[in-house]
């Protein structure tokens, strides 16, 4: 059974693309699974964080079409999670990922710190996003990790 929680997330991201005219945001989030050697590096929660932050920064759009996008800030997220994710109360994560999409590449640097807050704080936040009402968008499954030189 899923539980809802409210999290205050402080974040920084730097995303650049080369030879990619545009992709769904979930493609970028799915690409976070890969490090340079093709190993799995992230949990689903970080994908939810980055996807929500990008959708909020892009005013609800589920599509990324920039050569480079850099931002940092804070956002309150309302999420639903399974009881197996007992580490969602607070934490931090930092990772980098480079991956191919078609003939182009996307590079992502993402850092986040999160803390569980009350619903009252979430409701009073100017910058908030409700992930429980956000439908999934198309995910490209044919991604290859970019090999380190």
From Swiss-Prot:
Organism listed in the record: Tibrogargan virus (strain CS132)
Domain of life assignment: Viruses
Family recorded in the similarity comment: Belongs to the tibrovirus protein U2 family.
Protein name: Protein U2
Gene name per UniProt: U2
């Amino acid at each position: 059974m899923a539980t809802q929680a409210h999290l205050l997330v402080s974040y920084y991201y730097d995303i650049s693309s080369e030879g990619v005219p545009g992709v769904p945001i979930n493609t970028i989030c799915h690409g976070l699974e890969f490090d340079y050697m093709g190993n799995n590096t992230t949990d689903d929660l970080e994908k939810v964080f980055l996807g929500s932050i990008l959708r909020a920064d892009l005013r609800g759009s589920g599509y990324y079409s920039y050569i480079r996008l850099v931002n940092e800030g804070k956002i309150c997220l309302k999420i639903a999670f399974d009881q197996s994710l007992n580490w969602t109360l607070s934490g931090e994560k930092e990772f980098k990922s480079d991956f191919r999409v078609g003939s182009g590449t996307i590079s992502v640097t993402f850092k986040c710190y999160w803390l569980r807050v009350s619903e009252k704080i979430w409701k009073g936040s100017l910058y908030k996003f409700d992930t429980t009402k956000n439908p999934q968008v198309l995910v490209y499954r044919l991604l290859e990790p970019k090999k380190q030189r």
